[in-house]
């Protein structure tokens, strides 16, 4: 099969372009995929080519329902080397907000799914560009939320600043979604505001504490439950020790 038969219906999607990349949709062997290639002014620069290869290496093994999957890295006629991802047919959060179509149900789904994706990214020690409404897609078929660009750098350990920046981005996106959808959930508004508090304040320390807040489980309540459980165990052990016959 010739390259032209392998790749058909290649179309540029300028609204999805990124800082260093152009994004295309195409058919590969008849199957719809998306292509991500360096902008023409960067294609001959070895540093940018290395950056692209590094992004592929980092993202290839990621597997999460709220992150667009990478399938391959190969040369496409007329475009050069491309990162090939699953086709994501849908609308960006930015466009949904701008068109006034964001619903309360979508906002509640966003609050949970976006946090799940961020937690997964952090578990894999990935440092990335800030997540923005432009890089979040609601798929057209089932309305699933997916992040289309999570960055390309992987560290042995994330710093507290990396985690804080992720949660700040999460808070900003959630607050904009709440305002756009008219969602009046006091809990979601409180979570968004705490994520955006000035550094050094009482921000959430990690995604797990944010998750607890979303589910209405306060840290203090968890500590009380743990202490009560430990006290009960000590009492039970003491009772059994007292009941033991003395030889």
PLM region spans:
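AlphaC helix of the eukaryotic protein kinase fold
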Residues: 42-61
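Conserved short submotifs of the Hanks-type protein kinase catalytic core
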Residues: 77-92
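A short, aromatic-enriched beta-strand patch in the conserved N-lobe beta-sheet
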Residues: 72-74
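Activation segment signature within eukaryotic-like protein kinase domains
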Residues: 110-111
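Conserved beta3-strand ATP-binding lysine motif
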Residues: 36-41
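C-lobe/activation-segment region of protein kinase-like
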Residues: 146-194
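AlphaC helix of the protein kinase catalytic domain
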Residues: 92-102
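Protein kinase catalytic-loop region centered on the HRD/HxD motif
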Residues: 116-126
């Amino acid at each position: 099969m010739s390259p032209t038969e392998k790749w058909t219906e290649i179309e540029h999607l300028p609204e999805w372009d990124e800082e260093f990349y152009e994004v295309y949709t195409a058919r590969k062997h008849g199957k719809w995929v998306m292509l991500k290639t360096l902008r023409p002014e960067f294609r001959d620069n070895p540093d940018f080519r290395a950056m692209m290869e590094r992004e592929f290496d980092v993202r290839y093994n990621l597997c999460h329902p709220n992150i667009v999957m990478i399938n391959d890295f190969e040369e496409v006629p007329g475009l050069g080397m491309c990162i090939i991802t699953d086709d994501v047919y849908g609308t960006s959060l930015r466009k949904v907000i701008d068109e006034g179509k964001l619903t309360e149900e979508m906002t509640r789904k966003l609050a949970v799914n976006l946090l799940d994706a961020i937690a997964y990214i952090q578990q894999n020690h990935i440092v990335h560009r800030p997540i923005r409404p432009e890089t979040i897609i609601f798929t057209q078929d089932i309305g699933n939320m997916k992040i289309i660009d999570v960055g390309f750098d992987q560290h042995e350990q994330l710093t507290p600043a990396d985690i804080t920046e992720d949660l700040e981005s999460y808070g900003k996106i959630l607050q904009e979604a709440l305002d756009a959808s008219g969602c009046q959930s006091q809990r979601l508004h409180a979570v968004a505001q705490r994520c955006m508090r000035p550094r050094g304040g009482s921000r959430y320390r990690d995604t797990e504490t944010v998750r607890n807040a979303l589910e209405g489980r306060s840290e203090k309540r968890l500590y009380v439950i743990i202490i009560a459980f430990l006290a009960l165990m000590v009492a039970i052990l003491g009772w059994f020790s007292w009941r033991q016959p003395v030889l």
